Amino acid sequence: MMLRWSGIWGLYPPRIFPSLLVVVALVGLLPVLRSHGLQLNPTASTIRGSEPPRERSIGDVTTAPSEPLHHPDDRNLTNLYIEHGAKPVRKAFPVLDIDYLHVRTPFEISLWILLACLMKIGFHVIPTISSIVPESCLLIVVGLLVGGLIKGVGETPPFLQSDVFFLFLLPPIILDAGYFLPLRQFTENLGTILIFAVVGTLWNAFFLGGLLYAVCLVGGEQINNIGLLDTLLFGSIISAVDPVAVLAVFEEIHINELLHILVFGESLLNDAVTVVLYHLFEEFASYEYVGISDIFLGFLSFFVVSLGGVFVGVVYGVIAAFTSRFTSHIRVIEPLFVFLYSYMAYLSAELFHLSGIMALIASGVVMRPYVEANISHKSHTTIKYFLKMWSSVSETLIFIFLGVSTVAGSHQWNWTFVISTLLFCLIARVLGVLVLTWFINKFRIVKLTPKDQFIIAYGGLRGAIAFSLGYLLDKKHFPMCDLFLTAIITVIFFTVFVQGMTIRPLVDLLAVKKKQETKRSINEEIHTQFLDHLLTGIEDICGHYGHHHWKDKLNRFNKKYVKKCLIAGERSKEPQLIAFYHKMEMKQAIELVESGGMGKIPSAVSTVSMQNIHPKSAASERILPALSKDKEEEIRKILRSNLQKTRQRLRSYNRHTLVADPYEEAWNQMLLRRQKARQLEQKITNYLTVPAHKLDSPTMSRARIGSDPLAYEPKADLPVITIDPASPQSPESVDLVNEELKGKVLGLKRGPRTTPEEEEEDEDGVIMIRSKEPSSPGTDDVFTPGPSDSPGSQRIQRCLSDPGPHPEPGEGEPFIPKGQ
């Protein structure tokens, strides 16, 4: 029985075989590359193989020894002479030689990065698997397989060193999150995020540590020697939500912005609590006695670590913004300042045991608005894509090395301790979210629903930060560190695999609001700022100094002092609202070009253009034209609809995105109708035709004039115009002949008027030609002209040589030549 490839998990051979071949080749090369290298020279191979060199470990790779060890019998190999009989014979020049130790470190790092990139490509090529299993789970599985293969061939798998993780892999992820942080959402929910990050993490650490200490007392001889400080330290490590795991899972399920910023903001800001508790309990473990003063100093260190990290980040962010002011002549190095200053902020914070994550976030948030105002658009694109690429590769390497380190590490298993840790983590998370949400909802305008609380509790994932902190434990002070590391890996695997794989179907089952992918329009931005100013004025009138008041004060200070120092040129003086009007006019111009109406742009003053207001001109010249009542009513409708949308966004805390525009289809249809009307008007203007019907318009035949050479005898019913040849341009020289006769003849010949046109002549000599359209099926859905803007009613100034439409000569009645 033959099976079709398309029926086996949706796999397709051309898609999966190249990825599998490359992966198998890389995995097969790794054990070989981790050896001491291949030598084509047998003498050198014997000498180097007799005594293996000592190796120095840097992170997850092993570097070559600084000084090669030579065999004692190695005498003057540089002369390349070998004794052969009685004559000294010079050795042949080596055509090919391999020195793997020279390129070992960068080559292995490149192989791991290449493996990570190929894994990401392979997962997205197979959409069936990636839609069910999160990418982080698949990467951990790949790490387990690679580690098992390396260990199976007798080699030692590389281990994820804590220094490599904290100094090289973690900063790109945090910088990407901090630089592109949605600042408005973050500040509007800052109180809720801080409560979850600080109070929630403290609750989880002490609740978990206390219960685990009680379990250790009754758990058996293997865990009886674990003290209270040990369990509290372990609780502080395992209680923090990991930002890498949260980003990896929440970006795939596209959860709404409120829940995403709450969970992700908690994972970012709980770093200060984790660092303080970790160093506090680590120091207390070496003390013989812990006093009240030590506890007070530990409490004080929390503010020093958190606020100190923020201060370091702000300083480096301001320096980066000020430096970017002078890079207008050297655009190439602009992105480099963003990366270097941010990384130096992280390293400076780690130098003083401050929160490096807080420093990175603060530096990214502070420098972004000023740097983007100074740098070019190409530099901005470079920064964006480089940060995304760097963070994506780092995240992939972290999850792969989690799997490899699980195979390489030494483990100690205890069912009681591991299962208790897993259960207490879940219980502490659920209780903490429920209690804190009950307290938070008393002060929030937009309450957190039970569905939101469930997603927040279920999204508390653990990751590589807990693993790296557990690996840093000293075995001298913590003899049970192997048991702690095993329990940490178990919790990480449970949260990433079980919770990460089931959160997507649970979100769909509970019908939790998803993220809106549409971008915010200029109209949305303008009215959002209008509401901010309105709420600021209301707070001033009421005497209540809320966050709108302080935000307005900060914006005024920023505009008056900071922008002048950090932003170069005139860009710091341009009002933001005028910039939005400029964007709106540009958008309207693009729409006109796309609709084909660029040649018909009116020359009147735009009602939305702020460029028409000249500050130095007279007051009478700055008055905008008066609007009609229809225009005012249309503006009221637009404002009313947008204010209603903004109020709905405030209820859902989703103000930075737009729902699907219900008027978009009507707007497109209106553009299509305008385009058809312009095309019809252009035909009328170019060809002097007045259509009675859009499908069959009668043409207009030109009347003959007296100065025309008469090759044929004209018909009697045609009017003759006599023009004085002395002054043919003067209107007095034009004599309209047989005008009344033409009307009578036309009336007698044609009978009642059947042409769907009606002529009316006013006092100025302007003919009003109104076309009557007969009802025909299928014409209503094409275009229905109105009484004012339709080309059916045209005011055409009568030409002196054109008496108007008249019947064409009938077929078969040619002109007779004169004199015949």
UniProtKB/Swiss-Prot annotation:
Cellular compartments annotated: Cell membrane; Basolateral cell membrane
- Residue ranges, annotated region (PI(4,5)P2-binding region): 513-520, 556-564
pH behavior: Fully active at acidic pHs, the antiporter is virtually turned off at neutral pH.
Which GO terms of type biological process are on file?
A: cardiac muscle cell contraction; cardiac muscle cell differentiation; cell differentiation; cellular response to acidic pH; cellular response to antibiotic; cellular response to cold; cellular response to electrical stimulus; cellular response to epinephrine stimulus
Residue ranges of the region described as Interaction with PPP3CA: 688-691, 719-724
Annotated positions of the Phosphoserine modification? 603, 606, 609, 652, 697, 701, 707, 727, 730, 733, 790, 801
The parts of the chain that form a coiled coil are none
Q: How does it sit in the membrane?
A: Multi-pass membrane protein
Keyword S-adenosyl-L-methionine on entry: no
Q: Where is this region: Interaction with CALM1?
A: 637-820
- Sequence intervals crossing the membrane: 103-125, 135-152, 163-180, 191-219, 227-253, 257-287, 292-326, 333-345, 355-375, 378-408, 415-442, 449-473, 480-509
Keyword annotations for this protein, in alphabetical order, are: Antiport, Calmodulin-binding, Cell membrane, Glycoprotein, Ion transport, Lipoprotein, Membrane, Palmitate, Phosphoprotein, Sodium, Sodium transport, Transmembrane, Transmembrane helix, Transport, Ubl conjugation
| A GO CC term attached to the entry | mitochondrion
Extracellular face: residue ranges?
A: 1-102, 153-162, 220-226, 288-291, 346-354, 409-414, 474-479
Q: Give the start-end ranges of region Confers pH-dependent PI(4,5)P2 binding.
A: 544-549
Q: Return the annotated region ranges for Interaction with CHP2.
A: 519-549
What does the record say about tissue specificity?
Widely expressed.
Q: How does it assemble?
A: Homodimer; dimerization is crucial for its function. Oligomer. Interacts with CALM1 in a calcium-dependent manner. Interacts with TESC. Interacts (via residues 504-563) with CHP1. The interaction with CHP1 occurs at the plasma membrane in a calcium-dependent manner. Interacts with CHP2. The interaction with CHP2 occurs in a calcium-dependent manner. Interacts with EZR; regulates the cytoskeletal interactions of SLC9A1 and promotes stress fiber formation.
NCBIfam families linked to this entry: b_cpa1 (TIGR00840)
**What is the recorded name of this protein?**
Sodium/hydrogen exchanger 1
